[in-house]
């Protein structure tokens, strides 16, 4: 057989092999990226930077909050002191505004006679709305963000940035925790906190100090009855949900610490997860948005796997 006559058949056979089902592995789905992740794609909780809040109702379960010392070092240090000294124990959730925030602290904070002492915590702190962008280990999203020129993740936290100003800041995504303030920008000290329980109110960015995010248990806050007074505050004391206690992981016995870990946001696995969310490949999807934003690219949290 001549070479010229054998080429078409050989070429067809080669093409059939190349384009055969399974010749190339399909890009993974979100679930597959998480399932295939390795131990180094996850990180443990930092004991001094994690709070566990328990509501008075034991059915609510623990609310685990990871603090963000890189972005709000003064507030985080103060919150550590408040939690260590038991400031939040016995206080209450004082406000639940639908599609907005759940807020907790001292119901008598405005009363000079009844307000709970802050102990050794600072009463006055500087506003911590943003930090220098330079040298920040930001994993950027290529997707357009309507609120900032740049967005991405640092230490598992959603971040926006403006390279022209050289500043970066945490964003008000679902589950983010902030320090309530009055009119003065430096009137927050971490004794009054809130968590976002609705659509991301990004207009609050750069107006309030964000201190971390809820890793586990946000449903306990999001499912509380809504306050009926102005801005979702409770009009009667008996409407409030009590707080049993708030502790740092560092102050808890090993056996009581939540055994969870967080996916790192500086790895190839994290970037693969972002791509899988951007281009949905699950069979159910008939349309893929080919876009994500910093507030719907949620960082996974899972029960810690045994090393053995």
Where are these regions (language model features)?
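N-terminal signal peptide c-region/cleavage motif recognized by signal peptidases
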Residues: 20-21
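Cyclophilin-like peptidyl-prolyl cis-trans isomerases
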Residues: 24-308
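Bacterial N-terminal signal peptides that target proteins for export
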Residues: 1-11
């Amino acid at each position: 057989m001549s070479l010229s006559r054998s080429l078409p058949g050989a070429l067809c056979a080669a093409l059939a092999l190349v384009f055969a089902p399974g010749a190339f592995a399909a890009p993974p789905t979100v679930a597959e990226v998480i399932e295939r992740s390795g131990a180094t794609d996850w990180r443990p909780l930092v004991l001094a930077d994690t709070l566990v809040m328990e509501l008075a109702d034991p059915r609510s379960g623990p609310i685990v909050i990871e603090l963000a010392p890189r972005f709000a070092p003064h507030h985080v240090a103060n919150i550590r002191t408040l939690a260590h000294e038991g400031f939040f124990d016995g206080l209450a959730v004082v406000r639940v505004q639908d599609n907005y925030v759940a807020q907790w602290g001292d119901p008598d904070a405005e009363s000079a006679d009844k307000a709970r002492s802050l102990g050794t915590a600072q009463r006055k702190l500087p506003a911590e709305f943003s930090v220098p962008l330079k040298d920040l280990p930001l994993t950027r999203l290529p997707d357009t963000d309507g609120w900032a020129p740049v967005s991405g993740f640092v230490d598992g936290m959603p971040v926006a940035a403006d390279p022209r100003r050289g500043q970066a800041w945490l964003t008000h995504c679902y589950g983010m925790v902030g320090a309530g303030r009055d009119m003065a920008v430096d009137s927050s000290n971490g004794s009054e906190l809130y968590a976002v329980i609705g659509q991301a109110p990004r207009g609050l960015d750069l107006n309030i100090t964000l201190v971390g995010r809820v890793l586990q248990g946000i449903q306990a806050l999001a499912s509380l009855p809504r306050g009926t007074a102005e801005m979702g505050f409770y009009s009667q004391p008996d409407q409030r949900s009590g707080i049993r206690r708030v502790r740092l992981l560092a102050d808890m016995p090993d056996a009581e610490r939540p055994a969870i870990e967080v996916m790192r946001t500086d790895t190839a696995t994290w970037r693969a997860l972002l791509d899988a969310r951007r281009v949905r490949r699950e069979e159910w999807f008939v349309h893929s948005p080919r876009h994500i934003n910093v507030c719907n690219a949620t960082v996974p949290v899972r029960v810690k796997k045994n090393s053995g």
